Amino acid sequence: MLKTRAMFPHKDQAMSLSLDPQSDLVVGHTNNRPITNPLALSLLIGLNNKNKCISDSDFVRSPKSPLEFRVLSTMADSFFLRSPRSSLTAHLNCCCGPAAKVGLSIVDSLGDDRCLLPDIVFGPALRIKCSEVMDKHPKLLFPVANKSKKIENERSGVVFEIGDNSSETEPVGLRNRSFSANDCLRKTRVLSRSKLGQEGDFPGSGSDNAFSSEDDMEDYTCIIAHGPNPKTTHIYGDRVLECHKNELKGDEDNKEKFGSVFPSDNFLGICNFCNKKLGGGDDIYMYREKSFCSEECRSEEMMIDEEDLEEPCIDMHESLKKLF
């Protein structure tokens, strides 16, 4: 009986130490082989969650462990959750202070009205201040009021003086007015400085200085259209004068006057001394932009020019003798 009782504990111990045919789990016995059965691994997961007796490093040793995501999660706590950007931002905050203040200061400066650029004033909005001469003669080419209006910009502090027109009820823009050829002639002569002393029929014209300021103004523009229907347009400030006829009657006189100074188109086709026609193969002799057929004609022209130059020299010499 004692032998049989002694054998039962050995049988129970042998049964407890036997292996499960469905799993490789060993109870109470250390096995050095790696655990590859997924059922056994699932049991180990439960044991790890309940008893905390198996560490994560034990599961890493198994090449087929389904708990690799747990290892990655533990590694992400130290590596992936702490991004380089966050670490760099923390380092900059420790060294240089918070960088958000710099960006906010830039945004605040952009939103500030004082940092805006000054207003741009275009040409039509700007006028030239009237001179004292035009104040004395208000009935010149165009009526101009004596007072000026000051426009002040509150932010930029720039002040412009703008001349007011007497007709304030007229719409803004260019106001076209057509005149006859005589009126256009009479009024446009004022704008020519070379004709100021010759013309005296214009009202208010007393001296050349009275209209010199108008000729120098930047608001005046003259447009001359040539062709079968010549037309001259005078733009003075915001006023337009249109003349449908060529009012410059002295154009032909000017051509005759300056014809001797400027050479004609066919100045190489004729001799300037004997009026001989010059062909394409003939020799041409030049002197002061004049063509000659021979050296004799050119020398004769040169002698005539020398005589013309000697006469004023002789007169000057005689006048000097009288003085001394």
Curated annotation (Swiss-Prot):
One of its GO terms (cellular component) is cytoplasm. It comes from Arabidopsis thaliana (Mouse-ear cress). Belongs to the FLZ family. May act as an adapter to facilitate the interaction of SnRK1 complex with effector proteins, conferring tissue- and stimulus-type specific differences in the SnRK1 regulation pathway. It is found in: Cytoplasm; Nucleus. One of its GO terms (biological process) is response to starvation. A zinc finger (FLZ-type) spans 266-309. Keywords: Cytoplasm, Metal-binding, Nucleus, Zinc, Zinc-finger. Interacts with KIN10 and KIN11 via its FLZ-type zinc finger domain. Forms heterodimer with FLZ2 in vitro. This is FCS-Like Zinc finger 11. Its main location: cytoplasm. One of its GO terms (molecular function) is zinc ion binding. It holds the Pfam family zf-FLZ. It comes from the Eukaryota. Induction: Up-regulated in response to mild as well as prolonged energy depletion. Induced by NaCl. The keyword Cytoplasm applies. PANTHER family: FCS-LIKE ZINC FINGER 11 (PTHR46868:SF3). InterPro entries: FLZ10/11, Zf-FLZ_dom.
